Regions:
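Gly/Ser-rich helix-loop-strand patches that form or flank binding pockets
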Residues: 1-26, 117-171
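Small/aliphatic-rich secondary-structure junction motif
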Residues: 9, 14-17, 24, 28-99, ...
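Amphipathic coiled-coil/heptad-repeat helices and related helical stalk/stem segments
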Residues: 18, 46, 109-110, 142
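Active-site phosphate/pyrophosphate- and oxyanion-stabilizing loops and adjacent acidic/basic residues
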Residues: 51, 111-115, 147
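Short, small-residue-enriched loops and turns at beta-alpha junctions
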Residues: 69-73, 104-106, 135-136
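A short, acidic, amphipathic alpha-helical segment used as a generic capping/interface helix at domain edges
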Residues: 84-85, 105-120
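Short loop/edge segments at beta-strand edges and connector loops
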Residues: 99-103, 161
């Protein structure tokens, strides 16, 4: 004879759902997510992730645009803002964000990130980095900028690799 077991309803209760939500892991209410934006095209792909995190946790987004001479970083920041506004309109949710201009350019913005996040009055709870690009010889010898941020940051760092054809040296 076959033995059949009764299946139990294993759907989470309301208390379990609240305990497992993203905000109870690392983002407290009123915290911020630091999103650096450089001239690389891959930066735009962070828009989906930072928008999702802001919607689910109620965190404030700080878009830190690199102070470049060209218009690529500015264009990437504008594309991220457009994505945030589109999602906010579609869902009817409020997503708060602000745009700041960094002191450094796209090649030196990483050195500024840990200074911003580690200040005593900083509400930043997470830094969102893109770690997918073509690495040069200096990255192989001295380490990539993402590794510098991870080693010196006082807040969690989330690395995003949007391209399957490239890899991250920080994995």
């Amino acid at each position: 004879k076959e033995q059949r077991t009764k299946s139990k309803d294993i759907s989470p209760t309301t208390d379990q759902t609240n305990q497992n939500s993203l905000d109870s892991w690392f983002l407290a209410p009123g915290s911020s997510i630091l999103v650096p934006v450089t001239m690389l095209e891959e930066e735009v792909y962070k828009a989906e992730i930072c928008t999702y995190l802001a919607r689910k946790t109620g965190a404030h987004l700080i878009l830190l645009r690199a102070n470049d001479y060209g218009s690529k970083a500015k264009r990437n920041t504008q594309r991220i803002i457009t994505h945030i506004q589109t999602i906010a309109e579609r869902t009817g949710e409020t997503i708060t964000y602000e745009e700041r201009i960094a002191k450094g350019d796209s090649f030196h913005i990483h050195k500024e990130l840990h200074l911003i996040a580690s200040s005593p009055d900083s509400p930043i709870a997470l830094t969102l980095l893109t770690a997918s690009r073509e690495y040069g010889l200096d990255d192989w010898l001295f380490g990539p900028p993402e590794q510098y941020v991870i080693c010196h940051s006082h807040v969690p760092v989330m690395l995003v690799n949007p391209r399957a054809d490239l890899f991250s040296l920080c994995d």
